[in-house]
Regions:
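Pre-Walker A (pre-P-loop) alpha-helix and adjacent loop at the N terminus of AAA/AAA+ ATPase modules
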Residues: 2-69
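Conserved AAA+ ATPase small/helical "lid" subdomain
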Residues: 44-45, 232-330, 334-337
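Conserved alpha-helical scaffold flanking the Walker A/P-loop in AAA+ ATPase domains
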Residues: 52-55, 112-139
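Walker A/P-loop
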Residues: 54, 58-101
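Hydrophobic anchor at the beta1->P-loop junction of P-loop NTPases
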Residues: 65, 140-141
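C-terminal engagement/docking regions of AAA+ P-loop ATPases
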Residues: 70-75, 297-467
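Walker B catalytic acidic pair
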Residues: 142-144, 154
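Canonical AAA+ ATPase core
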Residues: 146-151, 161-256
Length: 467
């Protein structure tokens, strides 16, 4: 089997060349300078929304596409189902359902066989599971919010890659890979979609990534819209030519998951920052946001558009998705460019964070009042503020990874401002030379931004043990 190519992934019908994310990266083989350091310059990589979807597919991450009508979300999901998984016909690897009240999941996964010879009918023994359907790798639900609450509950297990038959939990897909994808009309301050229902929070949490196709950066460009207009005369969804890439997708998925399981000091620091750091609340009696978020924000000095009042700590469900998507973006970038790519690790996790920490984490009061329910816009501003904190963390990370206390001293020397890790030898030398210096400490800087720091010392201790 040949390796997967970027051209094979390209959607045949869905068109969107808009830049969704930008990542700093070093491209090509390493070029060492005289000191043995990598001399490759940092370049900015631009990836489209389609690229992010490809990466999420390779990572095996569930996706939810939300927008007003006519943004192409059903066309996008249809292209994935038919062009990557061979469609839902007999030989395909995709399951497809419409989120309507009459939908019955048993129709998809079960059949009834009657023993005509015996003349008896036993409903339990007559029910059989459709093994070929259970083993399919893709499950798509169009307009999932047209299904009422009880029907939405049927999708919980599917999003977890499970199906229950006769009391037994069956694994969907193959080798642990089962991709769930859905479309919905959400994020409307004053909804005008009749026959729709609010999505259950538990179901939203099972969507590892959420894409708001109404967002300016995620919708097709005017040039794309002209291409679409010239290409088709009717507004119906086009079925892509059936193509089955499942074998190649599974191979890459294993590589990505293997890489994501490795301890990465950069990601570990980031996960603590967006987990324990963002979950800290100075106003709360127990010093954590929890159920108090966002109500206590109204009485806090950080209230407004400060980072800690905009978002709470990430859940244990979303944190692994951030790491896996970050690795998948690196793999997709190499696939697209056809050469080695080393993406800045903190850039990668920041961009992954934009899509994976969406529902239930943002301050809903601020989202409604200040952003008119434009959650992705609020998320982008949150990530912009978080990137400032990450850049602060970036200065301290080398010494933390080396197992050193995250304290930096800065001083003037020969007309230049010098920054260096604080150690006894450097301090003695500066005092002897009568050179004044200033100290900055990571924990102090994070506290000033209203973020938790109880993770810093354990992180440094663990890095020191791993040296």
């Amino acid at each position: 089997m040949n390796e997967l190519t970027y051209d094979e992934l390209k959607f045949p019908n869905y068109v969107n060349s808009n830049t969704a994310i930008r990542l700093r990266a070093k491209v090509g083989e390493p070029e060492l300078d005289r000191e043995g350091k990598d001399a490759r310059p940092l370049k900015t990589l631009e990836l489209t929304l389609s690229d992010v979807v490809y990466a999420a597919e390779l990572a095996g991450l569930n996706m939810l596409f939300v927008s007003d009508t006519g943004r192409g979300k059903t066309q996008l999901m249809s292209d994935v189902a038919w062009h990557h998984y061979g469609g839902d016909q007999e030989t395909g690897q995709a399951n497809w359902a419409d989120g309507r009240p009459s939908f019955d999941i048993t129709d998809l996964f079960e059949r009834t066989r009657v023993d005509l010879d015996s003349g008896k009918f036993d409903s339990d023994t007559a029910r059989q599971v459709k093994e070929e359907r259970v083993k399919r790798l893709f499950f798509g639900v169009d307009e999932i919010n047209r299904a009422p609450g009880p029907k939405q509950n049927e999708f919980f297990d599917l999003a977890d890659g499970k199906y229950t038959f006769n009391g037994k939990r069956l694994n969907l897909g193959e080798d642990g890979y089962a991709l769930f994808m859905a479309t919905a009309n959400l994020n409307k301050l004053n909804g005008d979609f009749s026959g729709t229902f609010e999505l259950d929070r538990a179901l939203l949490n099972r969507a590892h990534l959420t894409f708001d196709l109404d967002h300016p950066n995620f919708r097709p460009t005017p040039e794309d819209e002209m291409v679409i207009e010239e290409r088709k005369a009717n507004p119906k969804v086009d079925l892509a030519p059936a193509q089955d890439l499942t074998g190649k997708i599974l191979t890459i998925n294993k590589k990505i998951l293997t890489a994501a399981k490795q301890l990465d000091p950069y990601f570990t620091a980031f996960r603590f920052l967006v987990g324990r750091g963002l979950d800290y609340c100075d106003t709360d009696k127990y010093k954590e946001k929890g159920a108090a978020f966002p109500m206590l924000c109204n009485e806090c000095g950080y209230t407004g558009k400060d980072l800690c009042s905009m978002i709470k700590g990430s859940s244990e469900r979303s944190i692994p998705a951030v790491k896996t998507l970050a690795y998948a973006l690196s793999y997709l970038a190499e696939l697209k460019l056809g050469e080695k790519v080393e993406i800045d690790p903190l850039d990668a996790v920041l961009q992954a964070f934009r899509f994976t920490t969406y529902h239930g984490n943002l301050n809903e009061l601020v989202a409604q009042e200040e952003y008119a329910a434009r959650n992705q816009t609020m998320m982008d501003e949150t990530v912009e503020k978080l990137s400032g904190v990450v850049n602060t963390l970036r200065d301290y990370l080398p010494m933390m990874i080396a197992g050193q206390d995250p304290t930096i001293i800065s001083y003037q020397f020969q007309g230049n401002r010098v920054k260096a890790p604080k150690d006894q030898k450097t301090v003695q030398a500066l005092n002897k030379a009568n050179i004044s210096f200033q100290e900055t400490n990571l924990k102090k800087e994070l506290k000033e931004k209203g973020l938790g720091v109880d993770w810093v010392d354990p992180y440094v201790k663990r890095m020191k043990e791993l040296k």
